[in-house]
């Protein structure tokens, strides 16, 4: 996967503009045959400009434009800073009180293939701080969304792909392949990148063992684990991934995935996201929000190209 048309969401309160820095670095490490387009989007709004009943709609529109031009001048500094002959850099400043709506409208009206946005990283906390705007974007955005916490790619560049190898639904196998292919492509684009796979499988229901004393808990769990291991082996062999780069563990995805990401010091976690039931992952049911809230690394959220019925 090579990104050709990237939308970067600027953060007006972050002078370092990590999202733009990360996007530019990603493009620089791709082997591009043609120029890559990066659009820096900034959503601005000031309620005080809407409060005056004395202003005509024309006057209000003119004031909006003045504010936009002021911010456009400030954004130009970053376009100049990251100028690169391989990149067509441009800015788009919009007046909108809802940043998430502004982003989604921009995506709907243009052929972007990636959105990059900075999300807060508190030193005293062990996870990223996702804002309501971040959640809305991950839920609704139809294209991949890269949430970053800083501006550079670390070495070694370990990419952890979360997959569902339960084999319960056919579309999951196709989606697993999409996710792994994305991870491998990014690893190839990012020098010294390597891919790990992770899958979680459930424990035996406690109430089942209580209600059915004859129920073989150990046999059930061994069977579930065995099936996940077989399916994971088939997936990793399909892509030539080493066995020691696959992780199949008992537990909830929201515990297993962040745990493995921390252990291998993952630079990026790739998750599947499906917006029809809030934010969820096809591989994770409705637990993706819990997974994401516990991650301390960058996140790439991807929706399946083929929707499940």
Swiss-Prot record:
Record-level GO cellular component terms: cytoplasm
UniProt keyword terms in alphabetical order: Cytoplasm
Signal sequence residues: none
Keyword Cytoplasm: yes
Cell location: Cytoplasm
Record Pfam families: Usp
Lineage: superkingdom: Bacteria
Annotated PANTHER family: UNIVERSAL STRESS PROTEIN E (PTHR47892:SF1)
Matching NCBIfam families: PRK11175.1 (NF008380)
Function according to Swiss-Prot or TrEMBL: Required for resistance to DNA-damaging agents.
Family assignment from sequence similarity: Belongs to the universal stress protein A family.
Protein name: Universal stress protein E homolog
């Amino acid at each position: 996967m090579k990104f050709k048309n990237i939308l970067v969401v600027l953060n007006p309160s972050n002078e370092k503009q990590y999202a733009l820095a990360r996007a530019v670095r990603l493009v620089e490490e791709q082997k591009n045959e043609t120029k890559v387009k990066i659009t820096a989007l900034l959503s601005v709004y000031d309620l005080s400009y809407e409060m005056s009943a004395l202003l005509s709609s024309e006057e209000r529109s003119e004031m909006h434009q003045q504010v936009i031009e002021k911010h456009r001048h400030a954004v130009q500094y970053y376009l100049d800073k990251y100028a690169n002959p391989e990149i067509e850099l441009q800015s788009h400043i919009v007046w909108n009180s809802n940043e998430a709506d502004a982003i989604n409208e921009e995506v709907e009206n243009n052929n972007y293939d990636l959105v990059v946005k900075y999300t807060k990283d508190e030193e005293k906390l062990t996870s990223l701080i996702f804002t309501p705007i971040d959640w809305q974007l991950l839920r609704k955005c139809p294209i991949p969304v890269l949430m970053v916490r800083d501006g550079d790619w670390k070495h070694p560049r370990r990419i952890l792909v979360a997959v569902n190898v339960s084999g319960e639904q056919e579309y999951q196998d196709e989606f697993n392949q999409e996710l792994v292919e994305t991870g491998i492509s990014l690893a190839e684009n990012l020098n010294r990148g390597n891919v790990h796979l992770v899958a979680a499988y459930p424990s035996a229901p406690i109430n089942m063992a209580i209600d059915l004393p004859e129920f073989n808990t150990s046999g059930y769990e061994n069977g579930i684990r065995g099936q996940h291991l077989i399916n994971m082996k088939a997936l990793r062999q399909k892509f030539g991934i080493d066995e020691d780069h696959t992780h199949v563990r008992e537990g909830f995805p929201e515990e297993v995935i962040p745990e493995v990401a921390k252990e291998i010091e993952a630079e990026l976690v790739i998750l599947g996201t499906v917006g029809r039931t809030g934010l969820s992952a096809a591989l994770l049911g409705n637990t993706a929000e819990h997974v994401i809230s516990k991650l301390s690394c960058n996140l790439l959220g991807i929706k399946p190209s083929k929707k499940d019925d």
